[in-house]
């Protein structure tokens, strides 16, 4: 593939380098075959390939009152595609290739019912270890070796749990929690989002003609980021992040026809 954003940076760099000549009138910027090869190398990225291995089991226990899923995986990736800040100016994003990386982990899930089917519950957990095996960014003295660093944007842990209890045919109470482990935002692992959890709850009223649901999300108003980048376009490294949703509450009404 080709990075449109990076090609824009190449054009901007050449225009700045030749602006004095261009201001005098029409001007053709000369290019050699080596120049075109260098540009192609700069803006192009290779396809990503991977070998994936997975083993797991699905169990129904206690007369289907309890369901248990367990799996383990291993993935070997070559030319892993990474989204990074683009070019000299740091605006926009582009795709680059890391040399090699691997990911391994486990996933487990439990779900079941109690009290004659009135109480539904579920919980899940996932662990992922994703690291670079070979990745050198840049050339010569400016080269940076990321071997052994965690692959960015991959949370190391994910957890979730929920429970719903039907008090009557028309009233249901429920709660849920979702958690995400440490997530690095850059290849060098210099900044990250620490583990956080988001709590939610709902009360459902079920009638023949309509349903009403009162709900709340992020009840503890947890402060967390869903995405972060750094930028050095001004000469000083700055960090920018997208905040996760704060406390929210609302009412949903659904009519049946």
In which residue ranges do the predicted regions lie?
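Surface-exposed coil/turn segments at beta-strand junctions on protein surfaces, enriched
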Residues: 46-48, 61, 114, 154, ...
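Residues that define the transmembrane beta-barrel architecture of outer-membrane proteins
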Residues: 49-53, 102-106, 149, 155-159, ...
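Gram-negative outer-membrane beta-barrel transporters
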Residues: 65-78, 94-187, 254-256
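Membrane-embedded beta-barrel scaffold of Gram-negative outer-membrane proteins
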Residues: 1-6, 10-95, 102-104, 117-121, ...
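C-terminal beta-signal and adjacent terminal beta-strands/loops
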Residues: 76, 178-186, 204-257
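Residue-level recognition of strand-loop junctions within catalytic nucleotide-signaling folds
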Residues: 1, 60, 113, 208, ...
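Outer-membrane beta-barrel proteins
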Residues: 41-45, 58, 94-98, 111, ...
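Flexible, surface-exposed loop regions and adjacent strand-edge segments
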Residues: 4, 11-19, 84-94, 137-146, ...
């Amino acid at each position: 593939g080709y990075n449109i954003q990076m090609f824009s940076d190449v054009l901007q760099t050449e225009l700045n380098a030749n602006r004095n000549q261009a201001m005098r009138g029409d001007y053709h910027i000369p290019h050699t075959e080596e120049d075109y090869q260098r540009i192609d190398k700069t803006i192009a990225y290779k396809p990503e390939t991977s070998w994936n291995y997975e083993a797991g089991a699905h169990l129904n226990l206690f007369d289907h009152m309890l369901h248990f899923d367990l799996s383990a995986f291993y993935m070997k990736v070559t030319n892993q595609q990474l989204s990074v800040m683009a070019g000299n100016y740091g605006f926009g994003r582009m795709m680059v290739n890391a040399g090699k990386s691997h990911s391994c982990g486990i996933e487990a899930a439990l779900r079941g019912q109690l009290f004659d089917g009135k109480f539904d519950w579920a919980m899940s957990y996932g662990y992922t270890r994703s690291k670079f095996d070979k990745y050198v960014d840049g050339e010569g003295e400016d080269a940076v070796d990321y071997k052994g660093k965690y692959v960015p944007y991959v949370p190391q842990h994910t957890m979730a749990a929920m429970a719903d209890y039907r008090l009557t045919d028309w009233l249901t109470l429920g709660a849920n929690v979702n958690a995400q482990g440490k997530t690095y935002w850059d290849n060098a692992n210099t900044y990250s989002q620490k583990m956080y959890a988001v709590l939610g709850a709902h009360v459902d009223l079920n009638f023949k003609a309509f349903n009403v649901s009162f709900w709340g999300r992020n009840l503890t108003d947890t402060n967390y980021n869903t995405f972060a980048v750094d930028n050095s376009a001004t000469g000083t490294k700055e960090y920018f992040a997208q905040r996760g949703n704060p406390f929210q509450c609302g009412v949903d009404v659904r009519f049946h026809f």
